Amino acid sequence: MIFRSVSNTDFRARVRTLLLAGSTALAFVAAPVWAFSIDDVASKAKDLAGDKYSAPTSNLPSEFSEMKFADYQQIRFINERAYWGKLKTPFKLSFYHQGMHFDTPVKINEVTATTVKPIKYDRTKFDFGSLKFDENATKDLGYAGFRVLYPINQADKQDEIATFLGASYFRVVGKGQVYGLSARGLAIDTALPSGEEFPRFREFWIERPKAQDKQLVIYALLDSPRATGAYRFVLRPGKDAVMDVQARVFLREKVSKLGLAPLTSMYLFGSNQPSEQHNFRPELHDSSGLQIHAGNGEWLWRPLNNPKHLSVSTFSVENPKGFGLLQRGREFSRYEDLDDRYDLRPSAWIEPKGDWGKGTVELVEIPTPDETNDNIVAFWNPETQPEVGKPLDFAYRLHWTMDEDELHDPKSSWVKQTMRSVGDVKQKNLIRQQDGSTALVVDFEGPALKDLAPDAPVTTQVSTDSNAEVVENSLRYNPVLKGWRLTLRIKVKDPKKPVEMRAALVDEAQKPLSETWSYQLPADE
């Protein structure tokens, strides 16, 4: 190292210069850099919660508010005019026009590195088909919602991968998937006699993505008569779509039931509840069951029903590790529907971040005569609600996937299918005779079973409530699946009441070999 001598004066001058330069650099680093965050939305939500609720008012002319669904379908967004269409970013936005019950606009803003600006309604971005209307009456309208476009399936084609439309509903798909079940921001008093309250996203802020970005960040402000909230969504497209959700909710007043991370789906009929009418489709549903991974490590599977009466089931859990509505069984032969492709509809799996404490996973099943009604709801209901005006912070990861095998305990086994039929017994002449029982056939498969010998000492743990008598509980090896088949025949004591039952496979030491099968036979069936 070479030392160069300097005078004291030069040295002091150089030190003073360096100190000044350093202080300038420090000042530059310390200077606040503008950045939009969930705190900005939460501030608005908190202020809203302190004010009296003001219901949104419709600004739609009658020719739009009174239109039929077929007319609303004629209104098509011109994708060539997508927002960010000329920017070098893989994400684009298209918009929903107001119409029918989508009669109030939502504010949509774009967030850049330096500004927030509203995305204004532009009628010229839509093709209205053969609809006739006064163009002047639409000049001050807004958008009902928006879609996210991304080249998920082909590099040169923009596909719709997410949609936000109506109340606090949103849907997402991954590669090769088609829209099925929905998620919501918040559910209030679901299935209560007082009636359900549907909070709505009233304003959105969407970050303009850079060319290299593989994720899209969306903020939303939620409002309802008894709650407000701030939400941050980070959407990551892929084979499975993944969405990280961060929320801060404020109550205006106490609610009877608070539903966090709600999912909404449809179940019309399936193998565990066959159609009463002849139908070439063996099954017709967006989801086949509710899966729960409890904080104590237990895995539970509850096949869905389309009951004749409203049904609410609760599952007490502390610090859930996951829950969701899954579409188990991807074989096309289960559905045989070339138009609606129920075999390609995703499962939605909620993975809580942090400890959620004590509460219940609630499952609501509503009677429906057809597939146009969403009749299934699942959500987390915390045991303790926040005080009025105080924030409730929670976060979770939401997976939209067709790879249900990744959502099991990799060392256990699970229910492949549940089948229901009238019960019968085989007579000495080999003719089967119905005996007034109901038969439930449950196939289990998975790593815990596939390497066991057919004569391995696998047994069952079965329980039912007091409304049923078990007349058969048999277990046999299933060589097709390299698993085991459980057959239960029960006789219902009071058909006007449902029957609850549970079953699991265990080894000779009573150690679990499978998830818990939890089933409800609906009333009046």
From Swiss-Prot:
Which InterPro entries does UniProt cross-reference here? Gal_mutarotase_sf_dom (IPR011013), GH-type_carb-bd (IPR014718), Glucan_biosyn_MdoG/MdoD (IPR014438), Glucan_biosyn_MdoG_C (IPR007444), Ig-like_fold (IPR013783), Ig_E-set (IPR014756), MdoG_OpgG (IPR023704)
Role summary: Involved in the biosynthesis of osmoregulated periplasmic glucans (OPGs).
A Gene Ontology cellular component where this protein is annotated is: outer membrane-bounded periplasmic space
UniProt similarity note: Belongs to the OpgD/OpgG family.
Q: In which pathway does it act?
A: Glycan metabolism; osmoregulated periplasmic glucan (OPG) biosynthesis
- Renumbered to this chain, the signal peptide range is 1-35
Q: Please indicate if the UniProt record lists Signal as a keyword.
A: yes
**A Gene Ontology BP annotation from the UniProt entry:** beta-glucan biosynthetic process
For this entry, the protein name equals Glucans biosynthesis protein G
List where in the cell it is found: Periplasm
HAMAP family in UniProt:
MdoG_OpgG
